[in-house]
Amino acid sequence: MGNTLKIAVPMAGLGSRMRPHTWSKPKPLIALAGRTVLDYVLAQFDSLPKSLQVEYLFIVGPNQREQVEAHMSQHHPEKVVHFFIQEVMRGQSDALYLAREHLRGPLLMAFSDTLIETDLSNLDHIEEDGLAWVRPVEDPRRFGVAVVNEAGWVTHLVEKPQDVSNNLVVVGFYYFKRSEELMSAIEEQFQRNLTLKNEYFLADAVNILLQRGARMRTRQVNVWLDAGIPAAVLETNRHLLDHGCGNSIEAAQREGVAIIPPVYIDPSARVQRAVVGPHVSIGAGCVLEDVIIRNSVVDTDSQLRGLLLSDSLIGRQVTAEGKTSQLSLGDNTWLKE
């Protein structure tokens, strides 16, 4: 692999399924296990060979760049990031095509609300033209699947298949050895107007590549996490805390707080007369007093008092008092019962 590796992350979606949280921030900046979804998306690439030069291509919506750019400058200043604005939501292929001037040579593409665990340490020795990461599921009809022949090569991708015998669901993580060939396939996709509900899906461009003779294999993953809806964010938060992303030992040293691991409590948060856990993430600058909370995520600078909380997502700078048992509050909300 002689070229700089580009990593494209389309994130321009409106995040309507994550409202009210996405009224004020892009979906990738939703809090999750002490960090943000975007931080964990970037962590997927930690196993890349250190010899590779990496540049990121972020395709964002018209009102998202400022917050995402500020987050990257503060938390990932060492990363080279190019931004592209997708003014109209016309799908994955359209998003990638916006970055075409930067796309020569190898490309990784990952969705901004999906997390997987995979080893990328040998990516600089890949002989195939492409890779699609997959996971077997019981019912693949809601997803896209990769059809593989007896020799292990991908023959084509199928969106929302009716035949459930093929259950290798594509998890939204791809590698292309020559991204310029993908751009050419996307151009043909545009010319043929291959759309689904007025969106250009990447699967159609991949099928064009395969029809042209590209050789693609699959890689299976055991962990595939979603952060696209509130229930999935809480489930992903549980998984991450269960697998070492918390700080339960440090949190247990706080006075006046009962900790039920696993949890993450930012060192700057003030927690008094509280029972925290299991599966709770509390961000920087938060204040929790007289609170019992479990299976919840609380973003930065929020104040919670006198609450019994479970299965809740709390945004930034939220003030809530009372006895409510389940909340989903976006940023800058005030609630008193």
Model region roles, listed by residue range:
Residues 57-61, 134, 297, 313:
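Short internal beta-strands
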Residues 29, 146-148, 218:
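A structural signal for short hydrophobic beta-strand segments in well-ordered beta-sheet cores
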Residues 18, 68-72, 182, 186, ...:
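Hydrophobic packing residues within well-ordered alpha-helices of enzyme cores
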Residues 13, 113, 136, 229:
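Active-site glycine-centered loops adjacent to acidic/histidine catalytic or metal-binding residues
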Residues 115-193:
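Conserved core of the sugar-phosphate nucleotidyltransferase
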Residues 188-337:
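Left-handed beta-helix
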Residues 1-12, 17, 23, 30-31, ...:
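Conserved N-terminal catalytic core of the sugar/cofactor nucleotidyltransferase
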